[in-house]
């Protein structure tokens, strides 16, 4: 039997970064509105996070991996709301989390902004479409979001228009970051400490980062910002009805208009929630899945899927670095090659990001020779003696890259979902250019050996 609830003004599907920010801000600006925010997952108790366990490195590759497919494949996913994503025909793998806070629970907390040029790519570069507003129109909202998350950073980055001063100092560079910065300086290239949504000082009842490392399996001391610590408490204070463990199966369409949602709640009951306005914020895969499953048939729906194609170069150094200490993605970055240069043979540019080193078990797991005396030699040579430079490129919208439904029904009662993504020659050229620059920087920083990974399945 189906339960039909009283109507609300706005229902938000998804309590991740987008959905929770929207719900919290709307409730603040329009306190008389009746707002509900649902998520298929639940709340997580920080006492249960892997950082409290001695086997956290193993959990990071299995039940607490960033990919739902790896978590499900472990047979003991830490995220009970996971659903599989068929990525057989995709160059990249899904990284996402379902729960109150969404993927902000296991993100790396790097908090970059777009550049002014990103809003005018059609006018400037003849690709994609221009945005209907500019960077400077959006800038006040960037500032609001930075304030809500508590972004740590350093003002004055010459790659961007002037930003407001951060209320917290940036993450420390450490030995690894200092060595990388020296390499950029020798080449005369831009670099800057990352903006990170991580407390570098204790604030708002949350501790400062202690540089323990397992950020992507949830922050045990709450230093890393996630929306279960920021926007969702604000939303609750402002009267938003937060509903965990609600699997939304369908947008209800009546006479060509969306009138509500149909979902299964945590007790297994079928529920209809009528709403005047429906906001779907279930990430790029989950949103398309729900809309397609609801019978929407726009020819553009699910198509033109875009990632940031990624690759990286690792450099090995004679001196010991402090790579395993601190958030893996929050050392420093370079936008020396961010903008279009017609001489490169591709449009737009690349983002270079110096990342910290993986922990010991992860390092050992990816050795070319995984056992024996040679493995021990390689591990002694590489662990605490390496850094990586991640290359992120800008892909172009292509209709064949898409999210689609499968013929299989999953355990949540919805059709399965698959991702189809072929990397274009344009993306490959931009990644290769970035890999060349990353290797050049590592050599300038003193690396005696480098190793290219031409495609990182992020």
What are these regions (language model features)?
Residues 2-123, 127, 132-136, 140-143, ...:
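N-terminal glycine-rich phosphate/pyrophosphate-binding loop and immediately adjacent elements
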Residues 5-8, 267-277, 281:
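Core beta-strand elements of the Rossmann-like FAD/NAD(P) dinucleotide-binding domain
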Residues 24, 28, 233, 237, ...:
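Short, well-ordered alpha-helices that flank and scaffold nucleotide-derived cofactor binding pockets
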Residues 42, 48-59, 63-74, 79-85, ...:
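Mid-to-C-terminal "cap/lid" subdomains and adjacent gly/pro-rich loops that border
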Residues 61-77, 83, 87-89, 110-113, ...:
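Conserved redox-cofactor binding core of oxidoreductases
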Residues 78, 192-215, 222, 249-257, ...:
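A glycine-rich dinucleotide-binding beta-alpha-beta segment and adjacent secondary-structure elements
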Residues 110, 395-410:
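Reverse-transcriptase-like RNA-dependent polymerase core
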Residues 261-265, 391-392:
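Short beta-strand segments that buttress and anchor functional surface loops
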